[in-house]
A protein has these predicted regions:
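All-alpha RGS (Regulator of G-protein Signaling) helical domain and cognate RGS-like helical scaffolds
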Residues: 87, 98-107, 113, 120-194, ...
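N-terminal secretory signal peptides
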Residues: 1-18, 41
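An amphipathic alpha-helical core segment
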Residues: 179-239, 247-253
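C-terminal segment of N-terminal export signals and the immediately downstream linker at the start
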Residues: 34-72
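N-terminal export leaders
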Residues: 15-31
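Short, contiguous alpha-helical
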Residues: 82, 90, 129-151, 221-241
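Divalent metal-coordination and catalytic microenvironments
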Residues: 62, 89, 136, 192, ...
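Near-N-terminal "mature-domain entry" segment
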Residues: 57-124
Length: 263
């Protein structure tokens, strides 16, 4: 597996505009019990992106989990959740803030804008922003794309129809999505995306890249579901059995969040 030490993740804390308190799957909290939202996103394929667009020069901060650290057991154990969030995710936030220090225009961007404009970042900080900005966006969404078993709902009729059209059935989608995650060599992510014409597609990315990074990751669409397949996401519980982690992960997928992003 990919050596995570190459990504320089410190073990101490952040601070940032909160990611405005909830990676958007937040602004609709008043309208949905899951706290998921769809906010319009300029210059992207569809108005699906869930992240807020508010401007500020405050530092990014580590978002709170929408559930207890042990709430996803036995699929994801509490120790893994704690280390994953307070060490790995926290490190991405810390390193992103360091990279953006002295760049007030970039500090005024939301994290979705940073990802969308990743290919135009200054050369001196581009790699650091790509690794750590991607890591912050990806993890903030990952926490929202999960929910305690039995509380995440099921794919909506509209999403089910789109999955069936693209992959044959919802169950066949799960098989192909898991295959994308298993097939990702080293570290990375598996994604379900919505394209401009309303169809859905599966892709995977290396390291902390995501489909919002136009010019770096192209041809997939706007992400509506993502699964972390870095070893730190599962190794304590599943060791090297990534397929077992991906098979169990469906028990804690927050379909209510995915449905809201697809609608």
């Amino acid at each position: 597996m990919h050596d995570e030490s190459q990504h320089s993740e410190p073990h101490d804390g952040p601070s940032r505009r909160d990611f405005l308190s909830s990676v958007a799957l937040g602004a609709l909290a008043a309208a949905t019990a899951t706290g998921v939202t769809r906010s319009a996103l300029a210059n992207t394929l569809t108005p699906l992106h869930p992240l807020p667009q508010e401007k500020t020069t405050m530092a990014f901060t580590l978002p709170e989990l929408p559930y207890a650290e042990n709430a996803l057991e036995p699929t994801i154990d509490a120790l893994t959740m704690n280390i994953h969030r307070t060490k790995h995710h926290n490190a991405y936030v810390t390193n992103l803030n360091k990279a953006l220090d002295g760049h007030p225009t970039l500090q005024a961007m939301s994290i979705d804008e940073i990802c969308l404009n990743m290919n135009t970042m200054p050369d001196g900080i581009k790699t650091a922003v790509r690794n750590n900005g991607g890591g912050h966006w990806n993890h903030s969404m990952y926490w929202k794309w999960m929910a305690p078993k039995g509380s995440g709902g099921t794919p909506s009729p509209a999403l089910s129809a789109a999955l069936a059209k693209a992959f044959g059935s919802v169950e066949e989608f799960k098989v192909k999505f898991a295959a994308a995650g298993v097939g990702r060599f080293g570290s990375g992510w598996a994604w379900l995306c919505k394209t401009a014409d309303g169809t859905v597609a599966i892709c995977s990315t290396a390291n902390q890249d995501n489909p919002l990074m136009k010019g770096i990751v192209d041809g997939c669409g706007t992400p509506i579901l993502g699964c972390d397949v870095w070893e730190h996401a599962y190794y304590l519980h599943y060791q090297n059995r990534r397929p077992d982690y991906l098979a169990a992960w469906w028990d804690v997928v927050n379909w209510n969040a995915v449905n809201a992003l697809y609608a």
